[in-house]
From Swiss-Prot:
Binds 1 zinc ion. Belongs to the archaeal Rpo10/eukaryotic RPB10 RNA polymerase subunit family. InterPro entries: RNA_pol_su_RPB10, RNA_pol_suN_Zn-BS, RPABC5/Rpb10. The lineage of its organism: Archaea, Thermoproteota, Thermoprotei, Sulfolobales, Sulfolobaceae. This is DNA-directed RNA polymerase subunit Rpo10. GO terms for biological process: DNA-templated transcription. Part of the 13-subunit RNA polymerase complex. It comes from Saccharolobus solfataricus (strain ATCC 35092 / DSM 1617 / JCM 11322 / P2) (Sulfolobus solfataricus). Coiled coil: none annotated.
Amino acid sequence: MLIPIRCFTCGSLIADKWQSFITRVNAGENPGKVLDDLGVKRYCCRRMLLSHVDIINEVIHYTRPI
């Protein structure tokens, strides 16, 4: 699905970092280093970005037209 706007635990804004994070990780950078560079320090926010699975393209095939 879509990345949540805020961290579930602390409420910090994380959605603005998602595109930069995923682009750099797909380019081969270390995810921990990328999170450090983006300023994501709290482990709750880090797990939000590290554990997110983007499945919107798979789920959209199962929606019914309104």
